[in-house]
């Protein structure tokens, strides 16, 4: 009798296991969105926006942090048709894209701005299948924060940097206009003097290992001098993936946001991702 009862219990348990497995297998996966999602990330200084392509819910993707020009915001980037050309190309790679508030409109790559972006990056990574890798794109003033994030002492690792008409030399920005000087002094808490070399991303880059860089600049730019920013920084570019794109026209002109430049930008980050993936598989 005891054996019969044990046999019946075993049979029942097996049947329940099969039924449970079948029920689990019968549940279809949630459908992927057909268009990239936009996730709003709130901070006191203003919102940031994470763009997630559908593929980055199914497969692991890297994150590109985009830092905005002076006097602008993540909302301006989100609404900009020109910036959207670049973002759409990155989403197609596929890469997730964080349009960062950078701690305010005129933070000039300050330590406080970098700390806020570090927290935004961590929060953004919880919203998609993040592989842990991060890249940076800086527009004009945003070049300082993007470059600083890839240098020793940054609160998070960055595998490559793209600057479009980007500032790299904080001392150069501080010395070219009184309005910039006042904003930089406020952002960095300076007591009237110029920024110390250890606050200047270009000075730090000149002492650090070479970086994968994608630099877009114009000799006609009368806002961010090409020779004292992009040209000097080009000397710190890692051979191989790095690219220097010289264009004509004024600061942040329309040709910076052309499909051609967007394709070059996406290809740059795509190459870095392919290399990083290959290296990870070898470990």
Each model region followed by its residue ranges:
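Short amphipathic alpha-helix adjacent to the substrate-entry channel of hydrolases
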Residues: 77-97
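Bacterial N-terminal signal peptides
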Residues: 7-19
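Primarily recognizes the serine-hydrolase "nucleophile elbow" in alpha/beta-hydrolase
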Residues: 127, 132-180
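Alpha/beta-hydrolase active-site loop
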Residues: 108-128
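The feature captures the conserved acid-bearing segment of alpha/beta-hydrolase catalytic domains
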Residues: 174-231, 235
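Short beta-strand element of the alpha/beta-hydrolase
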Residues: 60-70
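C-terminal catalytic histidine-bearing segment of alpha/beta-hydrolase fold enzymes
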Residues: 231-283
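N-terminal cap/lid segment of alpha/beta-hydrolase-fold proteins
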Residues: 25-59
